[in-house]
From Swiss-Prot:
It comes from Mus musculus. One of its GO terms (molecular function) is heat shock protein binding. Forms a co-chaperone complex with MCM2 and histone H3.3-H4 dimers. Within the complex, interacts (via C-terminus) with MCM2 (via N-terminus); the interaction is histone-dependent. Within the complex, interacts (via C-terminus) with histone H3.3-H4 heterodimers; the interaction is direct. Interacts with histones H4, H3.3, H3.2 and H3.1, but not with CENPA or the testis-specific histone H3.1t. Interacts (via J domain) with HSPA1A, HSPA1B and HSPA8. May interact with TONSL; the interaction seems to be histone-dependent. Keywords: Cell membrane, Chaperone, Cytoplasm, Membrane, Nucleus, Phosphoprotein. This is DnaJ homolog subfamily C member 9. It is found in: Nucleus; Cytoplasm; Cell membrane. The gene is Dnajc9. The modification Phosphoserine is found at S109. GO terms for biological process: nucleosome assembly. It comes from the Eukaryota. The keyword Nucleotidyltransferase does not apply. Residues 15-82 form the J domain. Residues 171-248 are annotated as: Required for histone binding. One of its GO terms (cellular component) is plasma membrane.
C-alpha cells in the first residue's frame, strides 16, 4: 500500500500537510515542528505496551510523510501533482525511523522546561506568542489557552488583559469570538481545567508520589491516553523551541492581519 493510501487509512486523510497538522504554505520550520508534535504523540517509547504496535506503525508513516515534505524535490512533485515517489530512498520502509527521529530532535528534561518557564512568562517572546495565537485562532480563547506555552487556567485573566491591551492599541483586531465570548463558554473552560487539575492530583496521590520533577515525570507517564497526548503536545512545543536551528535566527515577526 502506498504512502497516501496508508495516511488515508490510518489518519483519515491523504493530505500530507493535514497529517502533520500544518498549512500547505507552511515553512520548513513549521513542517518540522508539526512532524515533531504529532510524532511525539505516537512515539513507541511514550505509549503503553498494548499500544506499541499501532503506535509504531503510525510513527513510521509519519516519518515517511516528513521525509517527503522535507525534501525539496519530492515536496515540489507532491505540491504540483499530488503524488509521491514510493521508490525513493527516503521512503524506504526498512529505514530506522526512530534513529532518524533522534537525529532530528534533541531530548530535553523537565528541569529544562521549568527553567524555560521562569524566563518565558512575562517575556517579550510570550507577549508575541499570545498575540500570534490570538490572530491564528481568530480570538478563540479555548484554542489560545491550549496553544500558548506554560499556561494554566489561572493565567487566563493575565492572558485576556494582554490581548485586550493589544486590541485597544490597535495591534490586533477585535475578533467577536474574544470580545463577545459568553460567560457559559468561559465557565466551561474553567471547569475543564479544574477537573484536569483534580485528576492529576488524584493520580499523584494514588501513586503515592511527592511533588517534584522525577515524580512529575512518573505521573505524566501514568496518566490516561488523552492527557498523555496533551502533555506530549506541550513537550513537542517546548522541544521545538529548544531545537531551533541556530541559523534560523529569531522568530518571525508577528503577522499583520490582512484586511
Amino acid at each position: 500500500m502506498g504512502l497516501l493510501e496508508l495516511c488515508e487509512q490510518v489518519f483519515g486523510t491523504a493530505d500530507l500537510y493535514q497529517v502533520l497538522g500544518v498549512r500547505r504554505e507552511a515553512s520548513d520550520g513549521e513542517v518540522r515542528r508539526g512532524y515533531h508534535k504529532v510524532s511525539l504523540q505516537v512515539h513507541p517509547d511514550r505509549v503503553e505496551e498494548d499500544q506499541k504496535e499501532d503506535a509504531t506503525r503510525r510513527f513510521q508513516i509519519l516519518g515517511r510523510v516528513y521525509a517527503v515534505l522535507s525534501d525539496k524535490e519530492q515536496k515540489a512533485v507532491y505540491d504540483e501533482q499530488g503524488t509521491v515517489d514510493e521508490d525513493s530512498a527516503g521512503l524506504n520502509q526498512d529505514r530506522d525511523w526512530d534513529a532518524y527521529w533522534r537525529l532530528l530532535f534533541k531530548k530535553i528534561s523537565l528541569e529544562d522546561i521549568q527553567a524555560f518557564e521562569k524566563t518565558y512568562k512575562g517575556s517579550e517572546e510570550e507577549l508575541n506568542d499570545i498575540k500570534q495565537a490570538y490572530l491564528d485562532f481568530k480570538g478563540d480563547m479555548d484554542q489560545i489557552m491550549e496553544s500558548v506555552l506554560c499556561v494554566q487556567y489561572t493565567d487566563e485573566p493575565r492572558i485576556r488583559n494582554i490581548i485586550q491591551k493589544a486590541i485597544e492599541s490597535k495591534e490586533i483586531p477585535a475578533y467577536s469570538a474574544f470580545v463577545k465570548e459568553s460567560k457559559q463558554k468561559m465557565n466551561a473552560r474553567k471547569r475543564r481545567a479544574q477537573e484536569e487539575a483534580k485528576e492529576a492530583e488524584l493520580s499523584r496521590k494514588e501513586l503515592g508520589l511527592e511533588e517534584g520533577v522525577d515524580n512529575l515525570k512518573a505521573l505524566i507517564q501514568s496518566r490516561q491516553k488523552d492527557r498523555q497526548k496533551e502533555m506530549d503536545s506541550f513537550l513537542a512545543q517546548m522541544e521545538a523551541k529548544y531545537c531551533k536551528p541556530s541559523k534560523g535566527g529569531k522568530r518571525t515577526a508577528l503577522k499583520k492581519e490582512k484586511k
